Amino acid sequence: MAENTNEITTSEWEVMRIVWSLGQVNSRDLIDLLQPKRDWQDSTIKTLIGRLVKKGFLKTEKEGRRFNYTATVPEIEAMENATQSLFEHLCGMKKGQTLAALIDQTTLSQTDILQLQQLLTAKAATAPEKVACDCLPNKCDCEKEE
């Protein structure tokens, strides 16, 4: 199983989304689904598949003359790992601001909103008054932005 989900390129994410949706897919089906959307050559798509196999995100099974591909990492796990990796690079003081911007720019269902409200209410009970800045000492504007 792959460990560095953040190493998936934007193009590889497109391949993975199809694999996650279909469960199992062969290269011909991937090509047929991706070409109208992205206008990629067969060889480009096969290269992306090969990279995902090498990175450990796809498993290959031979069936006759065809190769079938299945994901080795569940979609939700890949998304959570990629998000966590991004947030590891942010200053602690800017994570809330980033989440707020993301929520503002995202279409959410009523169920999603209710779930977020419940999560935030639970977190509020134990949240610190202030989150510490973890930038270089005296070298950032975090404290000034408050």
Swiss-Prot record:
Keywords: DNA-binding, Transcription, Transcription regulation. Pfam families: Penicillinase_R. One of its GO terms (biological process) is negative regulation of DNA-templated transcription. InterPro entries: BlaI_family, Cu_transp_CopY/TcrY, WH-like_DNA-bd_sf, WH_DNA-bd_sf. Signal peptide: none annotated. GO terms for molecular function: DNA binding. The keyword DNA-binding applies. NCBIfam families: CopY_TcrY. Belongs to the BlaI transcriptional regulatory family. This is Uncharacterized 16.5 kDa protein in ptsI 3'region.
